[in-house]
Amino acid sequence: MPEETQTQDQPMEEEEVETFAFQAEIAQLMSLIINTFYSNKEIFLRELISNSSDALDKIRYESLTDPSKLDSGKELHINLIPNKQDRTLTIVDTGIGMTKADLINNLGTIAKSGTKAFMEALQAGADISMIGQFGVGFYSAYLVAEKVTVITKHNDDEQYAWESSAGGSFTVRTDTGEPMGRGTKVIPHLKEDQTEYLEERRIKEIVKKHSQFIGYPITLFVEKERDKEVSDDEAEEKEDKEEEKEKEEKESEDKPEIEDVGSDEEEEEKKDGDKKKKKKIKEKYIDQEELNKTKPIWTRNPDDITNEEYGEFYKSLTNDWEDHLAVKHFSVEGQLEFRALLFVPRRAPFDLFENRKKKNNIKLYVRRVFIMDNCEELIPEYLNFIRGVVDSEDLPLNISREMLQQSKILKVIRKNLVKKCLELFTELAEDKENYKKFYEQFSKNIKLGIHEDSQNRKKLSELLRYYTSASGDEMVSLKDYCTRMKENQKHIYYITGETKDQVANSAFVERLRKHGLEVIYMIEPIDEYCVQQLKEFEGKTLVSVTKEGLELPEDEEEKKKQEEKKTKFENLCKIMKDILEKKVEKVVVSNRLVTSPCCIVTSTYGWTANMERIMKAQALRDNSTMGYMAAKKHLEINPDHSIIETLRQKAEADKNDKSVKDLVILLYETALLSSGFSLEDPQTHANRIYRMIKLGLGIDEDDPTADDTSAAVTEEMPPLEGDDDTSRMEEVD
């Protein structure tokens, strides 16, 4: 890529133009924008104004620590200049500007992470107005423009011009036009059918709708005509100079002629008699009007603000095309003063938990002056979906990021913001329909909060909602669960897994369901982390039904029966443990099974099968942790099941019976699968099952006409020992 820059003493006659190709994804995006019909093209202006606002934020932030940065232009503003003759709508800001490298990288050669994501969203039917959320808002100019010119001046570089008609390439050259001082001028050359965006009324309408809460003055420059009375001589002179004057006016748009209309009227009254000598002529002038005079919404009294105003502010703040779901507007006074306006969006952003993403979306102001928009210390990461503004009276204006990390004031603000967010969620929870929408989008954040925020864990746990064995298609809170607990029930029972159906049909919940004990279904991977920290709720312990030592409410008679069963099957447990050796830590009689013959449970402090699955899926997992945290497996057998009873009888008749060993291994492997674990050697297990199928179909292993492949399978299997006359179904290795 050519990167030749001209030295300042080089003659400027031969202007050097460099051509660059757009990065493939950006070229694709532009082609999509240009060749697809979108009805709401007006959002291009919102995006360009929003970019100007960001550029102004940057220079203002830099000037807090180095005031000389503003020597190239003290005023921070945005100007909109429509030109009907040239069909251009120029957006000028006095922001930070771009260096040549910025221009090449930001506008064409380096794709943002959102470029591809936005194209995918568009093709899936998303609204074009989402473009700003993906960081590629500039390209929306091509919704209305056939060509876009960008002229920019950064304090550290010369003035450059970028230009593209979107044909897969763009040009960059040193700009020899009118010096800018500092900032950026974006000039969309509008298509013939898009001239409505040059109309004063239309521009005002768009700015009011999308950008009225931008923190810098947006001024519209419009060329207008007015009548002026002059004497005949003056009129002739005026006509002679008309062309010259038009030229001058175009050049000096920021220096408008100010006409004292009042004095005209007085003159008219005084010189009524001289009217015959006067002549009316049309005079052109540039009218300037500030379009966003509204004072910051967060400084107003919440009682005076309508929901529509909050909605408009939210949209201008976030570039979201939908309304917010909930809002919290409050001020804190006393030793510390600040105001905050917080919004919950309707949807989680596409990159909510991406590491590269900025950690929050709260803009920090100090006494109405914008300081920064991703101050990590302002709100914890689990609340990174909250959008809004915080305006402090106490922080110094020239505060740096380093100082913010140490700031006690900020710690107090953060604590208050978290408290108010939780209040907002609790209020939202009273409206079931809206809370359902909120929970679908942000349940992971609540659970992450339980994992990370020990101080607010209790409050956050009240916001959790889960499906249970008794709740049907509705999610319920832990509080609801507690109100339905049986009289003699001491614990809250839960099971973790992949899907609702999987956990509902699990062997682990059989006895609990039979006894009418409600079980909570935790089916998101983050639930495993959440429940590690959430040990109890309202004094009741949370107990996993997949771990050892499950205590169920029992009367004395049931306890006595259970003890008898333990004694009766003690010998079988010992034989099974000897057969399985190190595969399991112990074999015990179960109190949780009803219809399944056996299941694998894990030790109290180890991982569950579900957690082991999650950890195995981590690309950067630590294998040493896997070693000691991986589930210590316990095999539990169901003493009331016919398979286990028959196995006990066979084992007692002959403990060296080979078929007992085969069946124990098959039972263990099947229990592993049904309990949510994966097999270390699935092929051997599959071969055992195929052998069983053949026996069930009456296929003779010794038959020479048997299929070659089955012979191959048989060769791999160790020969069965024991009496050939025993049932062939039992001879399974």
From Swiss-Prot:
Region annotated Interaction with FNIP2 and TSC1, chain positions: 285-621
Entry binding sites for ATP: 51, 93, 112, 138, 401
N6-acetyllysine modified-residue sites: 58, 84, 444, 459, 490, 586
Modified residues (Phosphothreonine): 5, 7
Any single GO CC term annotated in Swiss-Prot or TrEMBL for this entry: perinuclear region of cytoplasm
Region (Required for homodimerization): 683-733
Domain of life the protein comes from: Eukaryota
Residues with the S-nitrosocysteine modification: 599
InterPro entries, per database record: HATPase_C_sf, Heat_shock_protein_90_CS, HSP90_C, Hsp90_fam, Hsp90_N, Ribosomal_Su5_D2-typ_SF
UniProt modified residues of type Phosphotyrosine: 314, 493
Cell location: Nucleus; Cytoplasm; Melanosome; Cell membrane
Reported modifications of this chain: ISGylated.
GO molecular function, one term: unfolded protein binding
Spans annotated as Interaction with NR1D1: 629-732
Residue spans of biased composition, Acidic residues class: 230-246, 256-269
Region (Interaction with FLCN and FNIP1): 285-733
Keyword field: Acetylation, ATP-binding, Cell membrane, Chaperone, Cytoplasm, Membrane, Nucleotide-binding, Nucleus, Phosphoprotein, S-nitrosylation, Stress response, Ubl conjugation
Sequence motif TPR repeat-binding, location on chain: 724-733
Record note on domains: The TPR repeat-binding motif mediates interaction with TPR repeat-containing proteins like the co-chaperone STUB1.
Subunit: Homodimer. Identified in NR3C1/GCR steroid receptor-chaperone complexes formed at least by NR3C1, HSP90AA1 and a variety of proteins containing TPR repeats such as FKBP4, FKBP5, PPID, PPP5C or STIP1. Forms a complex containing HSP90AA1, TSC1 and TSC2; TSC1 is required to recruit TCS2 to the complex. The closed form interacts (via the middle domain and TPR repeat-binding motif) with co-chaperone TSC1 (via C-terminus). Interacts with TOM34. Interacts with TERT; the interaction, together with PTGES3, is required for correct assembly and stabilization of the TERT holoenzyme complex.
Family (UniProt): Belongs to the heat shock protein 90 family.
The name this protein goes by in its record: Heat shock protein HSP 90-alpha
Source organism of this protein record: Pan troglodytes
Gene: HSP90AA1
